[in-house]
Amino acid sequence: MNKHFILTTILILSSLLSQSQEDLSILKGKELHNKVRLNFIPVEMPSDKFPELKPTMGLTGLHYQIPINDWLYGGADFHFAVTGDQGGLFTLGAELGINKQLYKNLYFDANFHFGGGGGYRKYINDGGFINPNIGLQYKKNNYSFGVQYSHVNFLSGEIKSNSVSFFVEIPSILRFTDYDKAHQEFVANNISPDSFWSKPVVKNAQQIRFDFFKPIGKSKKDNGSPLTETLSVIGFEYQKYLNNNTFLFAHTDAIYKGLRAGFMDLFVGAGYIPFQSKYINVFGKLGIGAAGGRIAPEGGLTIYPSAGIDLKLSDKLALSGHGGYYKAIDGDFEAYTVGFGLKYFGLNGGTSSEEKKHTNFYTQGIRIEIQNQSYFDVAKFDPPTTRYTTDLQLIGLKANYDLNKWLYIAGEAGFAYDGGSGGYAHGLVGGGIYSPRFLNNKVRGFIEFMAGAGGGAGVDTDEGIIVRPTLGLNYDITNSVSIIASGGRYYSPFGNVNSNNINIGLSFNLSTLSVKN
């Protein structure tokens, strides 16, 4: 009797399990042909009014552009100073653009950016800026370059410039499905070569990083005194693999100990894995980008070669350790670095890799949010003795990864555009819990906790550690777009910031196909 009961139970569970996996051929997919654009804008500085300034700042932009239709695109972008004496100037913005064919490979391209950020407050004030561009683009085989007439305007500040800028653009393909297909499992035993998903998988990795910079040489603080303190920074890195050994990456860091909050960096680059086994990867990387804030005024352009080892905890998780050398190209700041992090690997968007064809898959829910963030009565401190409060407005970019139907993890960057605090920025990581859906499945609540590093522009976070608990609601306009509203508290445990916070924005929702190991 017991044997029959056990056998029956096993058969029922096996049946339920098999029913939970659907055939991959029924999953409808979509493909977006996105673009990654890198541009350079020479910005005329107000050196007549401020003789201490160099006459020109070189501003580089990194843009991720998504087609809305065959002539209209939108996206998000970072700008950062690389030449001149404004190292540490960073901005985050949103953009809308037009791209129309004129003749054969020649295209008209125009766009408009709005964002927030900055560096030295007396030159940019609130931090809000606009950057319209208009010009020509030459395309061939999905790659392109172009020239534009550009206007850079920090609206309440002193930096206002017209110039000729240049850009290059490379393709980036995103294959995905609808957000309501998230958290489902699929099997592909005999998938047709003509199937939408019969493509190579894209390997990627995401990493939370902790780095420690030991300054050497002539490194100086912004007051001219020698910089000898070890700088502790927290950061995030994204890696996209070109093949099993070579990858591209982007990463950013913000300081939380060693100096008053305000130092940050942003790098892009490439890496190579000369040795890998079941348990470890040995890698080398070269990053080039920008860094600055709370150090002596420099151009910003910085290189960061490094090498390290990944210790694999599973097929998807690894502990990563690294060491490197950090050097300003147009300045004196340099440091030896050591660091560690937790790395998550994924295989997305297809069914085959260099090693094998995969058969078991799941769909991963992702939400990308653009927000307006309001912070009220934020404590500020301007040395030596001036203390006061102000209301801040930030533009925020946030990515949420659903672990299941109820839990998610998130990462966020935010930059000030109003409140006399241009140059304030934060980077946060954390997670949250969803409520059940209600009101015809259109509304879902959430509770969230985020923590990280933030500072600059006199915002009194001390060395930079901040936390932000919030409660909020999502309302689905469509399956792909939601309105987000939330409120909570913004608190610095070692500084004097303790403020109410309200966030309103849009969420763009999708699901990606991932290999289930």
Description of each model-found segment:
Residues 70-76, 104-108, 138-147, 174-179, ...:
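Repeated loop/turn-to-beta-strand initiation elements of outer-membrane beta-barrel proteins
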Residues 54-60, 86-92, 126-132, 160-164, ...:
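Residues that define the transmembrane beta-barrel architecture of outer-membrane proteins
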Residues 34-38, 72-76, 108-112, 145-147, ...:
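Transmembrane beta-strands of outer-membrane beta-barrel proteins
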Residues 40-46, 78-84, 98, 114-120, ...:
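Transmembrane beta-strands of outer-membrane beta-barrel pores
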Residues 42-61, 76-77, 213-237, 376-396:
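Surface-exposed strand-loop-strand hairpins of Gram-negative outer-membrane beta-barrel proteins
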Residues 40, 160-192, 209-215, 335-357, ...:
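Outer-membrane beta-barrel "beta-signal"
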Residues 62-66, 94-100, 134-138, 166-170, ...:
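Residues on the lipid-exposed face of transmembrane beta-strands in outer-membrane beta-barrel proteins
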Residues 1-25:
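Bacterial Sec-dependent N-terminal signal peptides
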